[in-house]
A protein has these predicted regions:
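A short, Trp-centered hydrophobic/proline-enriched beta-strand micro-motif
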Residues: 16-27
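Flexible, small-/acidic-enriched active-site or ligand-binding loops
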Residues: 36, 57, 84-116
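N-terminal glycine-rich flavin-associated loop
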Residues: 1-5, 31-33
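Alpha-helical interface subdomain recognition
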Residues: 3-5, 16, 43-48, 108, ...
């Protein structure tokens, strides 16, 4: 962000009056390309005018600030859209197959007007590819944390649960599942660490972050499924 954007938002984000913040990235069409969103941003005088629909936006109804990803002259950019901005509408809560604990919404932008200063990074803009890489590493770390917790819970349960006079952890089928969960979690953890290390070193890191995100997505589903089986 620019110096002005940092002075405006960082003290609030680091203070007690933490504003609700969310990101409007996805769009509800089958060929959605995160680096070529259909939501458009055009310059009109001293403002940007945003038009488009964003889907699966978490906690949008309560957000004080929404980071809207939009295309400006064919390049992806990020815009800081504050709650109550003219032309910004948050639709009723979406009905999802999963993630019922996390409310998601559609965000509609109809000639939504924001000042030129609302463009993240100022006139030069932001490196959206790098932002995407950082977000993938963060989500990968989240998946690893969830999987480690599920594995630990299943392991403790298997050591305590008795069947036929011994803990079920001693049965080969259960032991194999616990072992597979352990190596998958550790492999995913190392992939996330490698991706994070590359980003910290200023390297490209795009391929590593993408690989880590894909692998951890598959891994956490497998580990959670095995944990449910072990718990009966």
């Amino acid at each position: 962000g620019t110096t002005e954007q940092k002075e405006r938002w960082l003290p609030a984000l680091a203070g007690d009056d933490f504003p609700h913040l969310t990101a409007a990235w996805g769009e509800s069409h089958w060929d959605f390309d995160p680096l070529n969103p259909r939501t458009l941003a055009t310059v009109q005088g001293d403002n940007y005018v945003l038009n488009g629909h964003k889907a699966i936006v978490p906690l949008a109804e309560d957000a004080d600030l929404i980071l809207v990803y939009a295309s400006e002259e064919g390049a992806p950019q990020v815009f800081l859209v504050e709650k109550g901005a003219p032309g910004l509408t948050v639709s009723p809560r979406e009905r999802n197959m999963g993630l019922n604990a996390l409310a998601t919404y559609e965000v509609v932008l109809e000639n939504c007007t924001v000042p030129l200063s609302a463009k993240l990074g100022g006139e030069q803009g932001a490196d959206v590819k790098k932002l995407l890489a950082y977000s993938r590493v963060g989500l990968g770390g989240l998946s690893v944390g969830l999987a480690r917790t599920a594995h630990a819970y299943a392991m403790n349960y298997a050591k305590e649960r008795q069947a036929f006079g011994r803990p079920i952890a001693q049965f080969q089928s259960i032991a194999f599942m616990l072992a597979e969960m352990a190596w998958e979690v550790d492999a995913a953890r190392l992939m996330v660490l490698e991706a994070a290390w590359n980003l910290d070193k200023g390297n490209d890191g795009l391929s590593q972050s993408a690989l880590a995100k894909v692998y951890t997505d598959e891994m956490v589903l497998m580990v959670a499924d095995r944990a449910v089986q072990i718990l009966g």
